[in-house]
Amino acid sequence: MIRLIFWPTLVLGLTGLTAFVLTGITLVPTTVALGPCLRDFTSPFWEERASPLASTTFEVGDGAVRVCYGRPSARERVVFGELIPYRQLWRTGANEPTRIYTNRTIELAGVRLVPGRYSLYAIPDTNQWRLFITESVTHWGNDLRSGTRDKDVGVGIVPADTTADYFETFTISAEPAGDSTLMVLEWERTRVVAGVRAVRR
């Protein structure tokens, strides 16, 4: 599969592939390249961010998944229910939308994703979150106009638990779970777990 991917600059060495940006567009075989975690071109690279860009990469079957996201910190604020209101759509991070890259077909929170690039949004609630996955990846994080939502590919519902550990900074990590993987979202004293598994081609 070949997809049109918009990049703001030259990208080299995507898992062994050299990709060149011409007029802002790169032709990247999504079955080969996960892609790098890049800032939006409107955000100057030399400016320090309060919520730095981070990534986590994990194996799923014979493929891999990469999650790129901004990491906001609590800074003595009440996060869920105040800073991040319950039952309202959230970009699941900060700045750019949280992006998911996969080079094989997977299910994330029950939503089937073919190889490609996606954005992840959430509606947090006290005991469960709704995860929205969209094919729109070139917008700013809080740009939720109809054109963005029209590209939704699915919604998954996952449990939200309270933990004894306190996470000052929003963190996305991965934990093995038998034949699948758990994508774990933690911030403040909230822990949300979404299952990720390989789907047979």
What does each of the following model-derived ranges do?
Residues 2-83, 139-201:
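Primarily secretory-pathway and cell-envelope proteins
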Residues 52-53, 86, 101-102:
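Short structured motifs
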Residues 89-143:
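Mid-length scaffold segments of soluble, non-membrane domains
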